[in-house]
């Protein structure tokens, strides 16, 4: 801290201010005393940067000190480890007293009068762009006889830097349109990629046409299915044929007679039966697929088809030998126009296969199978049965069975006759 030497008339006042603690100064602060009356005895102090007065102000004496930022209150006393370095931050915009005088409104730097005007020899931005350079380079490739271009020659012709040519060739090489022949020579490969493109295009066109035809066919089938579903769900004449009611069953057969109902249901079908004194109901529910129900009613003797006559005549005694619960012969079923589709499903062959319920309860007889016999014994029986058809005896075409099997083989000049030890020339031709 620099203070005016003693002997000046203002030195006691300054020392009193410093002793009272009215001024907060650092060791490196500089104090400048400006007085209206010149002090001959005091040496002149060099003036420096000044700040607002930090103490009481006298009309004849002005004290200025270096501006200091407000220091925060110390949280804890620091240990005395020597003299710590002093850090200062000058805020000249707020604390400094001397402000530069305004020199008028700020004016930006004027535009150079000749900056927007280009010289006649200067190229435009589009002329130096990489897009135009690439087009011109491809023109050079197209005019080349074998597709080989020297990059040094191309840079001279196009009047561009060689690195611009390298930027173009790196991209074209990455998409496999050119290939490097040497350090500064490249070759165009675009014509090779077009080989066979016509055949591929023709094949893809045919595939596309087939897919379009298949799509049209599927659309036509979907339209037919949609129309049929609408007819089934909206037509009143068809809606009454969608279900078979109890009245339809009673119109087919006499309720007093026994009827056989065959149910064909997918796995995991839920069945619920309600048994009462008057009615017997069965409810079926399946989530795996549709449930098919077939009705097999008994027919009267008048409606027996010729194909079933022999079966009923031969099994008449077995039917009479049943448990004796058979009732009177059923009356012929009355025809109903609503059940024509269901009746058409029951063909004569299906009815002939299904006998009465009593026959279904009969135990099945076990078939006794005879043991297998040798082929020679069967051949003897066949010879006895067909002895009058052929003039001679049968000739065994296969060799006799031996203990050790072997594989048959033929040479190039042999045929099937060489596999058998017999003379086929003695056989007479068969006349049919």
UniProtKB/Swiss-Prot annotation:
Chain positions covered by the region annotation RB1 binding: 404-421
Subunit structure: Component of the DRTF1/E2F transcription factor complex. Forms heterodimers with DP family members. The E2F1 complex binds specifically hypophosphorylated RB1, the interaction represses E2F1-driven transcription. During the cell cycle, RB1 becomes phosphorylated in mid-to-late G1 phase, detaches from the DRTF1/E2F complex, rendering E2F transcriptionally active. Interacts with TRRAP, which probably mediates its interaction with histone acetyltransferase complexes, leading to transcription activation. Binds TOPBP1 and EAPP. Interacts with ARID3A.
Sequence positions bearing Phosphoserine: 370, 398
Modified residues (Phosphothreonine): 428
Residues modified to N6-methyllysine: 183
Protein name per its UniProtKB record: Transcription factor E2F1
Cited CDD domains: E2F_DD
Segments for region (Cyclin A:CDK2 binding): 65-106
Region described as Required for interaction with TRIM28: spans on this chain: 190-377
Entry keyword annotation includes DNA-binding: yes
Residues with N6-acetyllysine modification: 115, 118, 123
Post-translational modification: Phosphorylated by CDK2 and cyclin A-CDK2 in the S-phase. Phosphorylation by CHEK2 stabilizes E2F1 upon DNA damage and regulates its effect on transcription and apoptosis. Phosphorylation at Ser-398 by GSK3B promotes interaction with USP11, leading to its deubiquitination and stabilization.
Interaction with BIRC2/c-IAP1: annotated segments: 87-189
Motif residue range(s): DEF box: 156-192
Keywords carried by this UniProt record: Acetylation, Activator, DNA-binding, Methylation, Nucleus, Phosphoprotein, Transcription, Transcription regulation, Ubl conjugation
Gene Ontology biological process terms, A to Z: anoikis; cellular response to fatty acid; cellular response to hypoxia; cellular response to nerve growth factor stimulus; cellular response to xenobiotic stimulus; DNA damage checkpoint signaling; DNA-templated transcription; forebrain development
């Amino acid at each position: 801290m620099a203070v005016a030497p003693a002997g000046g008339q203002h030195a006691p006042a300054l020392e009193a201010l410093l002793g009272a603690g009215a001024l907060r100064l650092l060791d490196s602060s500089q104090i400048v005393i400006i007085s209206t009356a010149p002090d001959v005895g005091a040496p002149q102090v060099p003036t420096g940067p000044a700040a607002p007065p930090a103490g009481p102000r006298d009309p004849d004496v002005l004290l200025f000190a270096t501006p200091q930022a407000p220091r925060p209150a110390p949280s804890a006393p620091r240990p005395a480890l020597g003299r710590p370095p002093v850090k200062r931050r000058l805020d000249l915009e707020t604390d400094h007293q001397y402000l530069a005088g305004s020199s008028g409104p700020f004016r930006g730097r004027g535009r150079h009068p000749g900056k927007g005007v280009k010289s006649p020899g200067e190229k435009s931005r589009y002329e130096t762009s990489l897009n135009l350079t690439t087009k011109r380079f491809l023109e050079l490739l197209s005019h080349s006889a074998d597709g080989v271009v020297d990059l040094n020659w191309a840079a001279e012709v196009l009047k561009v830097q060689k690195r611009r040519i390298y930027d173009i060739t790196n991209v074209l090489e990455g998409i496999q349109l050119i290939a490097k022949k040497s350090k500064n020579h490249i070759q165009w490969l675009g014509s090779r990629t077009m080989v066979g493109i016509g055949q591929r295009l023709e094949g893809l066109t045919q595939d596309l046409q087939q897919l379009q035809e298949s799509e049209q066919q599927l659309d036509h089938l979907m339209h037919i299915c949609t129309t049929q579903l609408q007819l089934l769900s909206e037509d009143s004449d068809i809606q009454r044929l969608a279900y078979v009611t109890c009245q339809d069953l009673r119109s087919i057969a006499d309720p007093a007679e026994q009827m056989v109902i065959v149910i064909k249901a997918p796995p995991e079908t839920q069945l619920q039966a309600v048994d009462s004194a008057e009615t017997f109901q069965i409810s079926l529910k399946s989530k795996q697929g549709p449930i098919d129900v077939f009705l097999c009613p008994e027919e009267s003797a008048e409606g027996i088809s010729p194909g079933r006559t022999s079966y009923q005549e031969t099994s008449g005694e077995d039917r009479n030998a049943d448990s004796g619960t058979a009732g009177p012969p059923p009356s012929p079923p009355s025809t109903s126009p609503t059940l024509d589709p269901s009746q058409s499903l029951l063909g004569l062959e299906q009815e002939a296969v299904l006998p009465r319920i009593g026959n279904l309860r009969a135990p099945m007889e076990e078939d006794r199978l005879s043991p297998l016999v040798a082929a020679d014994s069967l051949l003897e029986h066949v010879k006895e049965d067909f002895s009058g058809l052929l003039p001679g005896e049968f000739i065994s075409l296969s060799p006799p069975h031996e203990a050790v099997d072997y594989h048959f083989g033929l040479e190039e000049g042999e045929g099937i006759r060489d596999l058998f030890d017999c003379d086929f020339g003695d056989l007479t031709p068969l006349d049919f």
